[in-house]
Amino acid sequence: MAQTLSFNGRRRVRKFFGKIPEVAEMPNLIEVQKASYDQFLMVDEPQGGRPDEGLQAVFKSVFPIKDFSGASMLEFVSYEFEAPKFDVEECRQRDLTYAAPLKVTLRLIVFDIDEDTGAKSIKDIKEQNVYMGDMPLMTDNGTFIVNGTERVIVSQMHRSPGVFFDHDKGKSHSSGKLLFAARVIPYRGSWLDIEFDAKDIVHARIDRRRKIPVTSLLMALGMDGEEILDTFYTKSLYQRDGEGWRVPFQPDALKGQKALADLIDADTGEVVVEGGKKLTPRLLRQLQDKGLKALKATDDDLYGNYLAEDVVNFETGEIYLEAGDEIDEKTLPVILSAGFDEIPVLDIDHINIGAYIRNTLAADKNENRQDALFDIYRVMRPGEPPTMDSAEAMFNALFFDAERYDLSAVGRVKMNMRLDLDVPDTVRTLRKEDILAVVKMLVELRDGKGEIDDIDNLGNRRVRSVGELMENQYRLGLLRMERAIKERMSSIEIDTVMPQDLINAKPAAAAVREFFGSSQLSQFMDQVNPLSEITHKRRLSALGPGGLTRERAGFEVRDVHPTHYGRICPIETPEGPNIGLINSLATFARVNKYGFIESPYRKIVDGKVTSDVVYLSAMEEAKYHVAQANSVLDEDGSFSEEFVVCRHAGEVMLAPRDNINLMDVSPKQLVSVAAALIPFLENDDANRALMGSNMQRQAVPLLRAEAPFVGTGMEPVVARDSGAAIAARRGGIVDQVDATRIVIRATEDLDPSKSGVDIYRLQKFQRSNQNTCVNQRPLVTVGDVLNKGDIIADGPSTDLGDLALGRNALVAFMPWNGYNYEDSILLSERIVRDDVFTSIHIEEFEVMARDTKLGPEEITRDIPNVSEEALKNLDEAGIVYIGAEVQPGDILVGKITPKGESPMTPEEKLLRAIFGEKASDVRDTSMRMPPGTFGTVVEVRVFNRHGVEKDERAMAIEREEIERLAKDRDDEQAILDRNVYARLVDMLRGHVAVAGPKGFKKGTELSNAVISEYPRSQWWMFAIEDEKAQGEIEALRGQYDESKSRLEQRFMDKVEKVQRGDEMPPGVMKMVKVFVAVKRKIQPGDKMAGRHGNKGVVSRIVPIEDMPFLEDGTHVDVVLNPLGVPSRMNVGQILETHLGWACAGMGKKIGAMLDAYKAGADIQPLRDTIDSVIGSGPKGEPIKQYDDESIVRLAEQTRRGVSIATPVFDGAVEADVNEMLEQAGLKVTGQSTLYDGRTGETFDRQVTVGYIYMLKLNHLVDDKIHARSIGPYSLVTQQPLGGKAQFGGQRFGEMEVWALEAYGAAYTLQEMLTVKSDDVAGRTKVYEAIVRGDDTFEAGIPESFNVLVKEMRSLGLSVELENSKVDEVGASAQLPDAAE
């Protein structure tokens, strides 16, 4: 095969251990956020054709707004967004919100109302564009920038609207009887509960208020007693037959009962069944076949039945008995004497059909619709006298008014499914039929038919994403606005106003601002590393407004449910009080239009697995049999086994292969992104896997990122989708590269309206939300040819486009002098020396110069009483230089504040009067470095208010910025020129010119030589004979001029933004931000972890020569305690160690061959070795087709260690690990002989040594260590504050007091409780004594004692502290005899 392919070295090549082919493409990982918000804004939809959802639906639901008299109406026409004022980067730097102005077209219609007829005619129509505030936009990475910080709106899980049937699990009543209840939950509006009580009466509640009988609710809907009974029961007709009765034979009702007396055929009079015999279905069927129509009944059989209809005298209208009344010895003669010989009775046998509704009707005091409506009115508005109109209006508004009650499309779909209705999902209010269906189903449940709902099933919980949350919030804002508009429409002269005058957009804008600023679901983005960003955007929270609270959430809600499979990760959730309430979306899951989470499955057609993928929600999936992704298949795609393990209706079972309808698409579809990054997840205990996936999110980006030897194949996906690594937007050729930007000349997607140049600005040493460092590095070189989607730059924690959260470290599992006791970690000094775990952290300090009452503060170098030494890092403007090394206490920005005039003595006044004004007092309020922070200043930004004169520093920063913009413009212009002129030459060449620049002989055929005699700018003067070609040239010229002017315009806009002043908070004249970067090497006290929940704290860093070493002299980097493995059951780390060891061994082998090739050997052995490792398997590289140069590149990349991917649940098994160790020429045990670095002797037994991927977590000892001498005190108790942030002290708590008491250290204890804490006078005395060099002091009364006395007084106890004098003997004061 010809060696034609080349390998560019810009991606990491992995040996892939997965055996199951991936059928479905993994959806973009932040699709949840982007799709939802796009659907809400619908920016790209044409204005006329927007569907009624999102923002459009909000406007449609609030408008039109009519005034109270109906004389005018404000209609909504359409909305559009203008371009945002600042782009994302500018908003980040200036602390602004990235948003676009929303313009809404409104139409005001004024009517003429005829006073006599009341007919309306249109008098005037005005249309106008109205500004309705700014709407925040989402960045490409799925975040929002609010006041300069990146925020994420977390999706919320809540109970789906619809109807739910449940029971109390026998808790309410002592007998343990199940009380059933149904609840109709709308998206917004009143809840309706229908429930049984212990006496089997059915009640309804509205909004959890007082109960009313359900029959009252039905009466309010316009039904009467007879109609209610008719709806819920069937009836039988008893006909008088001589002395007895004739009753129809109903086999279904008699099934399973015993015949109490002989059953006699009413027509023939013969006994068909003898008394005491059981009525089996077979016997009943035989009777039916014989033609049995009716049975004989006696009066006794009739007693205890209930009338199905009113018994009425048709002539007089007198009602003898009502429907539902019981027939007994007293009532039967009444019916007979009135001359009725047919009695309809309800089919209630108290076994299959209970008399619940009839009993409720009997117990209900309300007789008619009016009573029922009044009753409901009294429940909803206690204390108000009801009238028929008000009661009817209120009842209609509760469930039947679309303004107040909205089931939403989801709610309607769920109701249809549960109640077997078929109502279009545009009907969003309740109907009478819905309420009847709910009551019917509830009664059936009580009769033992049907199942209750499981509220933790994902079919009954749905996700509200950004778009929907925002929609609800904006609707609230518009409703607030609506009230104001109505009032204004009524109060002003409507003929003269425009829509603009009616509208005050503040409430709408405030609602948006409030949502992004202070909602529980709007969170500060977790930006420690790319993985934590992605996980944050894919998080699902059950908390938040309208959700659960931590305290109320029980065990069931938090638990893993069978429907979570493939939708929500069972592993990744926080430890602690939020466990199970905050979840993560599974890798392949997506949210459908109704808000239910869907998971993909492969279809099975005629017993063969196809590549067709369908997405199903939990409700739809329940009816299928779903096989696992790792089921064994034959060549033709049918199942090998006769019985297949599958999931059906939440159970795992074995089913015949013909019954299987679907199959999972991938083994990793059940876990989240973070869990899918853990190799050998299948060998770890679930609790440790949870810690592992949570700790990967806390890994600090290191100075030199390194992709793991043992990965899972998810790494490139995370790096790409998180936006950390930059992918090319379209194919092209790299034109320029430096550390800060990449310029690419596009060769595909060339659109004349867009620029043909892509400029990618790289982020250099920017601060993330968590103070880690965001830095991007280019991977391409000039001239590289790129395809769309190629990675062109690495970001934080990425390495060649792979996620790289930590480093591969050589680990030995063995104890070492007790330094790895209790999960401690022992490190080699090499790790510090080679900056293996060094990270950069950036702190931001900001200082504002305000305008105070006494005059403006000033940022200056001229600070009173400060030595020149302290000012050495400041420039003439008083701001620190970039590159200055700063320490605690150093001045970053010099600032002085005017101080109030101190009162003057007469002498001073005299001197003032003679010598003129002395400069007013100022005090030094400079910003200094806080204690414990060292670093280098990496960036300074100066912001000035409009109209405030800029200082030197601000001007210099501005000049740099403009130069940078000019360079971008010039480069883009140069590429544009090059492209256009190259195309122009192609168009001109070979044509005969009829005109040209000065001195050109017309009629000459144009060639490259002829054209190049003239300067480029004159080439446009050539005119050629071919008119079509000449037309194309003209068009090119037009395009070129347009592009040029567009480029210039863009540049001018940007410059204008740089030069104009900044928006500042009120009273602020100037603001300076200083960014200080610090390199943090690893040190004892830092927390480290592997990917399997194996965490520990660095206990000691040992000199390299003292660390244990291998036979070839290599010292290990890390020593871990072997006891950390067995009890924790995270065996994955051991498999990773062995496999990592094999990878490194293989790398060494390849490295040796590469050196041999460079020394002149043949390349074939190297090619074969690489092919045997990476070329095999389903996703192998086409090594045989690579040219020699590519092979060398590959060998260089794999020299430190071959990278492999072992996907979760489908990865390498023990045999694969052994095979790989053998290939690398290592022992299959994975153990090695180790020598003690201090004595040089071998250790007693073989030790497991290998490579583990270790992470440094964002719990650094530098951020935690803290010391205080004097500092702030609490206002009330006068005790020192607590915590590092407040510069607080250490709490000397109850147990510590016991310890001192146990030692009998009375004086130490007294100091602790008084002068070292809250004895104010004593503190001062001690300080004075120390200053004097004296060591005597006296302890007084602690302030907290005074607080206690005050508390007791507030309870009405008169408590006073009496000082009894010390008597002559010198005995101590008596205890105060205080309580009177």
Swiss-Prot record:
InterPro entries cross-referenced by the UniProt entry: DNA-dir_RNA_pol_bsu_ext_1_sf, DNA-dir_RNA_pol_bsu_external_1, DNA-dir_RNA_pol_su2, DNA-dir_RNAP_su2_dom, DNA-dir_RNAP_su2_hyb_sf, RNA_pol_bsu_bac, RNA_pol_bsu_CS, RNA_pol_bsu_protrusion
GO annotations of cellular component type: DNA-directed RNA polymerase complex
Entry annotated with the keyword Transport: no
CDD domains in UniProt: RNA_pol_B_RPB2
One Pfam family here: RNA_pol_Rpb2_1
SUPFAM superfamilies given in the database record: beta and beta-prime subunits of DNA dependent RNA-polymerase
Keyword Electron transport recorded: no
Keywords of the record: DNA-directed RNA polymerase, Nucleotidyltransferase, Transcription, Transferase
GO MF: DNA binding; DNA-directed RNA polymerase activity; ribonucleoside binding
Family stated for the protein in its record: Belongs to the RNA polymerase beta chain family.
Subunit and partners: The RNAP catalytic core consists of 2 alpha, 1 beta, 1 beta' and 1 omega subunit. When a sigma factor is associated with the core the holoenzyme is formed, which can initiate transcription.
Annotated function: DNA-dependent RNA polymerase catalyzes the transcription of DNA into RNA using the four ribonucleoside triphosphates as substrates.
PANTHER family registered for this protein in UniProt: DNA-DIRECTED RNA POLYMERASE I SUBUNIT 2
UniProt-recorded name of the protein: DNA-directed RNA polymerase subunit beta
Organism: Sinorhizobium medicae (strain WSM419) (Ensifer medicae)
Organism ancestry: Bacteria, Pseudomonadati, Pseudomonadota, Alphaproteobacteria, Hyphomicrobiales
Gene name linked to the record: rpoB
